[in-house]
């Protein structure tokens, strides 16, 4: 009877067996252990730090709270979220903003103005600091204008001025109120006197609304300062403000350095301005749609609400 041949291990098998003998059982489970403790991919900005308390807040919780922290801080938000939170069910039509001639002064403050515009557009996804939407707010049709502080500090320039005028004209064409959410550090220095001209032009646009008998409601958000405060932000029929919003012309530090006195606690904040009669009501973000709908419905009651 022929004896069975013992298989001769291949070269690769010999190497594997030798490695297992050297490492023992640990070598067999090591790959699984390494996989279990390997660095995992985690989404960026998973946590957001509260500017008041330093608490780390889970981003999804903050989104569910409309970007209002447990401490009550109303975080700054852009046009997309503002439209989503303001219009009924978030449904709205985005209206175009006019194009303008860019950088007429060929301005550079260490970085060309055109490069700053390009960087702001890439960061925000917006063409400029103004965005316009049309839809229903608390059941009332309205044109809503949102100023984006993330776009070069929401500064008022030619494009923003044209955007405001376009929003006013859209409201007149549709015979509906205009609601403006303001957020700005002032006029855009890179456009010089051309930016200051927008203060007068936006004021004329508001006069057009008044001549048409249409309401103009302003919601002041953090921060609203400079030339914006000195023009369309303070010309509304009704002024609402989000809690804790900084509202004024010059900032508190500039004022303190000028008058060399300490300002009262909460100076220039929305709650302080309500006490002084500069703002009609401080309204939390979650209540804004219902409050705006009630105000718009009341102001339009004499002529009946119309939808375009």
UniProtKB/Swiss-Prot annotation:
Coiled coil: none annotated. One of its GO terms (molecular function) is acetyl-CoA carboxylase activity. Residues 46-308 form the CoA carboxyltransferase N-terminal domain. Its EC number is 2.1.3.15. Pfam families: Carboxyl_trans. Its main location: cytoplasm. GO terms for cellular component: acetate CoA-transferase complex. Component of the acetyl coenzyme A carboxylase (ACC) complex. Biotin carboxylase (BC) catalyzes the carboxylation of biotin on its carrier protein (BCCP) and then the CO(2) group is transferred by the transcarboxylase to acetyl-CoA to form malonyl-CoA. Acetyl-CoA carboxylase is a heterohexamer composed of biotin carboxyl carrier protein (AccB), biotin carboxylase (AccC) and two subunits each of ACCase subunit alpha (AccA) and ACCase subunit beta (AccD). Pathway: Lipid metabolism; malonyl-CoA biosynthesis; malonyl-CoA from acetyl-CoA: step 1/1. It is an enzyme of class 2 (transferase). Keywords: ATP-binding, Cytoplasm, Fatty acid biosynthesis, Fatty acid metabolism, Lipid biosynthesis, Lipid metabolism, Nucleotide-binding, Transferase. It is found in: Cytoplasm. The keyword Translocase does not apply. The keyword Cell membrane does not apply. Belongs to the AccD/PCCB family. GO terms for biological process: fatty acid biosynthetic process; malonyl-CoA biosynthetic process. This is Acetyl-coenzyme A carboxylase carboxyl transferase subunit beta. It catalyses: N(6)-carboxybiotinyl-L-lysyl-[protein] + acetyl-CoA = N(6)-biotinyl-L-lysyl-[protein] + malonyl-CoA.
């Amino acid at each position: 009877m022929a004896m069975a041949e013992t298989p001769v291990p291949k070269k690769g098998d010999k190497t594997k067996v030798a490695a297992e003998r050297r490492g023992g059982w640990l070598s067999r489970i090591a790959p699984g252990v390494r996989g279990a403790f390997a660095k995992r991919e985690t989404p960026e900005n998973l946590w957001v730090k509260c500017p008041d308390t330093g608490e780390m807040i889970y981003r999804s919780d903050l989104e569910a709270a409309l970007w209002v922290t447990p401490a009550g801080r109303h975080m700054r938000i852009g046009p997309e979220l503002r439209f989503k939170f303001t219009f009924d069910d978030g449904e709205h039509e985005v209206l175009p903003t006019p194009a303008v001639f860019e950088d007429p002064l060929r301005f550079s403050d260490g970085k060309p103005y055109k490069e700053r515009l390009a960087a702001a557009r890439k960061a925000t996804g917006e063409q400029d600091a103004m965005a316009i939407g049309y839809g229903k707010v608390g059941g009332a049709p309205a044109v809503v204008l949102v100023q984006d502080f993330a776009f070069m500090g929401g500064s008022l320039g030619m494009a923003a001025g044209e955007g405001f005028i376009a929003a006013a004209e859209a409201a007149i064409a549709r015979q509906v109120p205009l609601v403006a959410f303001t957020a700005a550090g002032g006029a855009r220095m890179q456009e010089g006197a051309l930016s200051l001209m927008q203060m007068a032009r936006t004021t004329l646009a508001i006069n057009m609304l008044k001549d048409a008998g249409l309401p103009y409601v302003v919601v002041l958000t953090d921060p609203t300062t400079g030339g914006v405060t000195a023009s369309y932000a303070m010309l509304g029929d009704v002024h609402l403000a989000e809690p804790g919003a900084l509202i004024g012309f010059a900032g508190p530090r500039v004022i303190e350095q000028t008058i060399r006195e300490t300002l009262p606690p909460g100076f220039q904040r929305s709650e302080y301005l309500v006490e002084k009669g500069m703002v009609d009501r401080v309204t939390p973000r979650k209540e804004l749609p219902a409050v705006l709908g009630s105000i718009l419905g009341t102001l339009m009651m004499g002529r009946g609400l119309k939808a375009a």
